[in-house]
UniProtKB/Swiss-Prot annotation:
Designated name of the protein: V-type proton ATPase subunit E
Keyword Mitochondrion: no
Function: Produces ATP from ADP in the presence of a proton gradient across the membrane.
Organism expressing this protein natively: Finegoldia magna (strain ATCC 29328 / DSM 20472 / WAL 2508) (Peptostreptococcus magnus)
InterPro entries membership: ATP_synth_B-like_membr_sf, ATPase_V1_Esu
One of the record's GO molecular function terms: proton-transporting ATPase activity, rotational mechanism
One Gene Ontology cellular component: proton-transporting two-sector ATPase complex, catalytic domain
Protein family according to the UniProt entry: Belongs to the V-ATPase E subunit family.
One GO BP: proton motive force-driven plasma membrane ATP synthesis
This protein's record includes keyword Transport: yes
Length: 184
């Protein structure tokens, strides 16, 4: 039996060596697979992080762009409010000019106009009583306007209302006001 025991022992010893060899190979293969999977996971992580970083930068850039645009729009709105305020002050100043200045303006403006004998002069309401007896070489209407003056020629109205005059020059005035107030 000892021969049989030797054979069995030898077979067991060979099986044990083979088992160790197989386990060794399996462990090495396992380590390679784990290493490969870790590398793949790291690459995927890097890809995801780069994509997330890129998306975050895109979101940040879009948000920053919106903030800049909103800020610019607010600045433009504020500038427009200032310009509108200046235009209103111009209208108010013209409307509230002294009687003497109004009379000079009126005389000067009328001298440049080709007036007919049927034309009617419509004066500014707050200046009417003071100027109704003046001679402007044109008939005086009983009607009044809020500011400036008008000439009535039949059904035609030549409007020299200060508000209308300023409004008709608004584009040019806005440019000049902006240049003066907001030059860099």
């Amino acid at each position: 039996m000892s021969n049989l025991d030797n054979i069995i022992n030898e077979i067991l010893e060979d099986a044990k060596k083979e088992s160790e060899h197989i386990l060794n190979d399996a462990n090495q293969e396992k380590e390679k697979i784990i290493e490969t999977k870790i590398d793949q996971a790291n690459q995927e992580k890097d890809t995801i992080l780069k994509k997330a970083e890129s998306e975050a930068k895109g979101v940040y850039d879009r948000h920053l762009s919106q903030v800049v645009l909103k800020s610019r729009d607010n600045a433009l709105f504020a500038k427009q409010e200032v310009i509108d305020s200046v235009l209103q002050k111009i209208k108010d100043k013209l409307k509230n000019m002294s009687l003497e200045d109004y009379k000079k303006y009126l005389t000067n403006s009328l001298s440049k106009m080709d007036l007919n004998s049927d034309d009617l002069l419509v004066l500014q309401s707050d200046k009417y009583d003071s100027l109704k007896n003046e001679n402007f070489n044109v008939k005086l209407s009983d009607e009044t306007v809020d500011s400036g003056f008008c000439i009535k020629r039949g059904n035609v109205l030549i409007n020299n209302n200060f508000s209308s005059l300023v409004d008709s020059m608004k584009d040019e005035l806005e440019v000049e006001i902006a240049k003066t107030l907001f030059k860099k």
